[in-house]
């Protein structure tokens, strides 16, 4: 499966709220929109309209990753995920793995240390080593769920990204573009310096030639 940014946010919110606020789960469209637009525990912070969330929900419904539920005597439709750990889902995750996947869907690439710090409401990890063990299990599958990103300058730990959405492919394309832009910028800077010097030398040569001509004319007039 490959989820869009909005679809990944919807699935992440449903996974999160099922664990952290089970009394409010499943979620109505309004509650789901509020969850998608939270200012905390979300990266990037979005400002989705209910229409945008509904479009994502409808798409997930067609992918059989969401189901609708309405109570007796209530016209409000509520939504629950079929992403994992349901009788309709092929994907079965441990509580630890579910917490990591949920956080990566909601907050993008993160280090094991960040995942441990941010996971306390979803799952209690004993230490970072336990997080790293779980990450390895999610990566060492026939079809991996996570991948490791190159370590960034100034970071002691590498970040990991989930492979359920388009986020990883966007990161892969963004990094070469950034690198090529940097190389191009350096090349232009290096090329620009000799060009400026050449131009300056040409101007000076012209000035010297003009002065020489005027001097010759002055000498000729005096003789």
From Swiss-Prot:
Organism in which the protein naturally occurs: Shewanella baltica (strain OS155 / ATCC BAA-1091)
Domain of life: Bacteria
Pfam families (UniProt xref): DUF480
Protein name: UPF0502 protein Sbal_1765
Family: Belongs to the UPF0502 family.
Intrachain S-S bonds: none
